[in-house]
């Protein structure tokens, strides 16, 4: 599990091509100079044999441009196993929510061609300055991850084709609505 710097700037193609072994390390493409999120992710993928889990800014799963093209190539290789949306205000340095992207180079047969999206944005205990994940919150997330199935208002298994139809946007909130339907009283 890694938590690299989010949206780190200054790591576009020109900078990354100066690195040793850049052809193997950045085989899915180069990110923009504005965000090195997918440079960090590709570095980890190039260094791993099986699974990688990355805590990263939510924009990493939804931004367009070069980042979308990198996501597309990684999806076409069927390397993304799960995207878990975490609550906001979990980290000291930002109030923004995060996602955990789980990559698996050796997906079991029952997970091939599929991605599990978990919307855990409401799974927290409120704190004064920060929210926290309780033991129960963590257990619920882990159980959903292990079961790899649809759970109403919490998780959804999508196909790579569905991700393609969503323009490679893997934001769990796009596929798993947690908003309660409002009930109106007649006037």
Predicted regions and their residues:
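A conserved structural/catalytic subdomain of Rossmann-like adenosyl-cofactor enzymes
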Residues: 1-187
């Amino acid at each position: 599990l890694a938590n690299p710097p989010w949206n780190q700037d200054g790591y576009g193609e020109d900078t990354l091509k100066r690195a040793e072994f850049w052809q193997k390390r950045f085989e899915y493409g180069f990110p923009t100079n504005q965000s090195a999120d997918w440079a960090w992710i590709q570095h980890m993928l190039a260094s791993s044999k099986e699974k990688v889990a990355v805590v990263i800014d939510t924009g990493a799963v939804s931004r367009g441009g070069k980042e979308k093209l990198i996501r597309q190539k990684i999806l076409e290789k069927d390397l993304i196993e799960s995207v878990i949306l975490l609550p906001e205000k979990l980290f000291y340095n930002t109030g923004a929510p995060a996602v955990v992207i789980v990559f698996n180079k050796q997906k079991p047969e029952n997970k091939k061609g599929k991605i599990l999206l978990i919307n855990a944005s409401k799974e927290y205990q409120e704190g004064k300055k920060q929210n926290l994940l309780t033991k129960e919150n963590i257990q619920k997330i882990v159980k959903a991850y292990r079961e790899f199935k649809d759970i109403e208002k919490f998780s959804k298994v999508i196909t790579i084709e569905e991700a393609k139809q969503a323009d490679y946007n893997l934001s769990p909130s796009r596929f798993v609505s947690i908003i309660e339907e409002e009930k109106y009283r007649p006037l």
